[in-house]
Swiss-Prot record:
One of its GO terms (molecular function) is ATP binding. Its EC number is 6.1.1.11. It catalyses: tRNA(Ser) + L-serine + ATP = L-seryl-tRNA(Ser) + AMP + diphosphate + H(+); tRNA(Sec) + L-serine + ATP = L-seryl-tRNA(Sec) + AMP + diphosphate + H(+). This is Serine--tRNA ligase. One of its GO terms (biological process) is selenocysteine biosynthetic process.
Amino acid sequence: MHDIKLIRDNPDAFDAGLAMRGLPAQSATLIELDASRREALGKQQDAETERNALSKQIGKAKASGDEAEFNRLRSEVDRLKAVLEESGQQARHFDEVLNQHLAALPNLPHADVPQGADEADNVEERRWGEPRTMAFTPRDHVDLGESLGQMDFKKAAEISGSRFVALRGGLARLERALAQFMLDLHTTEHGYEEVSPPYMVRDEAVFGTGQLPKFAEDLFRTTDDHWLIPTAEVPLTNLARETIHAEADLPMRMTAYTPCFRSEAGSAGRDTRGMIRLHQFQKVEMVSIVTPDESDAELERMTGCAEKVLQLLELPYRVMKLCTGDMGFAARRTYDLEVWMPSQDCYREISSCSTCGDFQARRMDARFRKEGEKRPAFLHTLNGSGVAVGRALVAVLENHQNEDGSITIPAALRPYMGGVERIEG
């Protein structure tokens, strides 16, 4: 959410930020709506002040027995009452329209974000690891999983429809091992607090993180008007909502392992084979709540935490700085981690780490008070996948496959697999 005062003070800078997103100028419309709202509020306040003054005079007129003056004053109060009602309705109308406009606008990009239209314009920052040279043609994760008899898309489709999977045996255990490994790493080495959050949230929560109102079609809604979480970012970030936090309590770093639910409404025909794009998938999420001064450094730190997961899993990856046309709605700056997929001979996204500045905090009214200062300020929020468990499983299968179809378990996961070194059919 954007601050209308900042837009009034810096309309050209605001429009320039929108232009980086490929959007037309909006400041003039927003400022006009705000002016109409403030004019209505001014009329309401003036009428309220005048009515209060007349009310005192009515009492005096009644006490003195001046019936004509009493009736005149009462008639004037009735007129002011109508003005109050009309101006109040106008103020509420303009406030609602203004907030609808503001809520539909994405965050403005950081000055460091490269200009671009889509993922083709993203900028590679660095790489880690070399893709393994295999003496055989690598198989994709679907072929590997089905050959092991432990990945069942057919039965999952009979139960739930397309874009679902049932994992069994060693692969089900591998999925659990990956999540436990990631949680242990983030909590014991990276300083995150583990949270077990709700999987269903209210409108206010998904509005706060920016999925509503613009992306409702990407979500699943229950019959009692809850939303299934598309990511643990939603409940974790909202733990800071409607609170003034002490500076001494910051940063807050939280992590959670949850299922995520997405309709993939805009992904028809994309990644229809396999586990890359499912309606339900598992993910370990990281969320940081920080002061504005810490925001940029925290993004680098968070990205490094996600990178450590991939390094310990011995998975080659690259870090991409997203361009203005590929960033998420609430993001101010984003790094994507893309892991090597041998069967596709390319890198695929496995983690996305973003700083949102105060964009989400304004929507949630999440603030902090600096030591020694009376007036609170808005927090900065960050989120990142640490990492997507399903895609990590896919990457482990493909990068650690053997010619006979077995999977070598990375050393970091073996303690979580009861010492098992291979998954075999």
